[in-house]
Swiss-Prot record:
It comes from Prochlorococcus marinus (strain SARG / CCMP1375 / SS120). Keywords: Carbohydrate metabolism, Lyase. Residues 64-227 form the SIS domain. Pathway: Amino-sugar metabolism; N-acetylmuramate degradation. A lyase-type mechanism (elimination/hydration) is suggested for the cleavage of the lactyl ether bond of MurNAc 6-phosphate, with the formation of an alpha,beta-unsaturated aldehyde intermediate with (E)-stereochemistry, followed by the syn addition of water to give product. One of its GO terms (biological process) is peptidoglycan turnover. Belongs to the GCKR-like family. MurNAc-6-P etherase subfamily. Homodimer. Signal peptide: none annotated. The active site is at residues 92, 123. This is N-acetylmuramic acid 6-phosphate etherase.
Length: 311
C-alpha cells in the first residue's frame, strides 16, 4: 500500500456507485441459489439504464458519425475496468468492420500492461491522459468518449477537459446522477444502475451497462458508415477460417448463389463482399466495381442505387 494521507482524501461515501445495496446485505451468509437470484435481479438494471439513456446514445451516434465522415476518429478513454471495457469494444472494430486500427482507439491508464495487470494508481494522474492523447495525435476533428462510473477519475476527467478545450467532440459515460458529477461535455450518458451488489465494484452493473452502450454506439456508427448491409457484416475482414466461412455465407445469401460461385467471386473481388456483390449484379470488373464503391463512400446500398440496381 502506498502512503496516502487522510488530509488528501476525498470522501466518496455519497457517490451512488459507492453506496451499499440493501438487496445484497448479508450476501455472504445466503445460499448459493439466493446469491445467484440477487445477481439475476440486479442485472436487469443495466438494460433499464440503457433505455433511459436512449436519447443521449442516439445523439452520440449521429455526432460521431458526422465526425468520422469528415476524417475524424473515435477514441475511448478509461482507467481500470472502464479502460478494459473500452479496449474490448475498440479492438473488435477492425475484424468486424474492416476498419483501420486507427479509426477506433481505446486509451487506458497505464497502457497495454493494464489489460492483464492492475495499475489502478495510474487513474489518479491529471496529466497522463493528456500525454496519451497527444501521442496519438488526438485533434479537434476527433471524438472522445470518457468513461468514469463514479464520475471522479482524474485520468478521464482531464482527458475530457483536454478534448473540450481543443474543440473535439467529448462525451462522458457515467453511472451517477448530475448532482454528483457534472462534466460540461457535449453529451453526458448517465447509466444509472444503482449501488453495486458488492459496494463499489463497478465492474458489475455499471460495467455491464457501459459495455452495452459502447456496443450500440460503435455498431450504430458503423452501420451508418455502410459497414452493414441488411443485418450482415459485409466489410468483414477475412483473417481466419471462421471469418472466411462467414464471408462465403454472406455472399451466397445476398446474391442467392452457391458457395462455390461465392468463393470465385470473392477471389475475383480480392476478399471484398461489397465488390463481389457489384461484380455479380452489374457485370463490372473488379477495378470498376471498387471505383464505384469509392465514389459512394464505400456504401454498397448507395453504390448499387447509383447504377440503378435494386438489391
Amino acid at each position: 500500500m502506498k502512503n496516502y494521507n487522510l488530509s488528501d482524501n476525498i470522501n466518496r461515501s455519497n457517490i451512488l456507485t459507492e453506496e451499499s445495496n440493501h438487496l445484497s446485505k448479508n450476501i455472504d451468509t445466503v445460499s448459493t441459489s439466493k446469491l445467484v437470484d440477487i445477481f439475476v435481479e440486479e442485472d436487469k438494471k443495466p438494460q433499464q439504464a440503457i433505455s433511459q439513456a436512449k436519447h443521449q446514445i442516439t445523439k452520440s451516434i449521429d455526432l460521431i458519425y458526422q465526425r468520422l465522415i469528415d476524417n475524424g476518429r473515435l477514441f475511448y478513454i478509461g482507467a481500470g475496468t472502464s479502460g478494459r471495457i473500452a479496449v474490448l469494444d475498440a479492438v473488435e472494430c477492425p475484424p468486424t468492420f474492416c476498419t483501420s486500427p486507427e479509426l477506433v482507439q481505446a486509451v487506458i491508464a497505464g497502457g497495454s500492461s493494464s489489460l492483464i495487470n492492475s495499475s489502478e494508481e495510474k487513474e489518479d494522474s491529471n496529466s497522463l491522459s493528456i500525454k496519451d492523447l497527444k501521442e496519438r495525435n488526438f485533434s479537434s476533428k476527433d471524438c472522445l468518449i470518457g468513461i468514469t462510473a463514479g464520475g471522479t477519475t482524474p485520468y478521464v476527467l482531464s482527458g475530457l477537459n483536454y478534448a473540450r478545450n481543443i474543440g473535439a467532440l467529448n462525451i462522458a459515460i457515467t453511472s451517477v446522477p448530475e448532482q454528483q458529477a457534472s462534466f460540461g461535455s457535449n453529451i453526458t450518458i448517465r447509466l444509472i444502475t444503482g449501488p453495486e451488489i458488492i459496494a463499489g465494484s463497478t465492474r458489475l452493473k455499471a460495467g455491464t451497462a457501459t459495455k452495452m452502450a459502447l456496443n450500440i454506439i460503435s455498431s450504430g456508427v458503423m452501420i451508418k458508415l455502410g459497414k452493414v448491409f441488411d443485418n450482415k457484416m459485409i466489410d468483414v475482414s477475412i483473417s481466419n477460417k471462421k471469418l472466411f466461412d462467414r464471408a462465403l455465407r454472406i455472399t451466397s445469401s445476398l446474391l442467392n448463389i452457391e458457395m462455390k460461385e461465392a468463393q470465385l467471386l470473392l477471389d475475383q473481388a480480392k476478399g471484398s463482399i461489397k465488390v463481389a456483390c457489384i461484380i455479380k449484379s452489374s457485370g463490372m470488373d473488379q477495378k470498376s466495381a471498387f471505383a464505384l464503391l469509392e465514389r459512394n463512400n464505400h456504401n454498397l446500398r448507395k453504390a448499387l442505387k447509383d447504377i440503378n440496381i435494386e438489391f
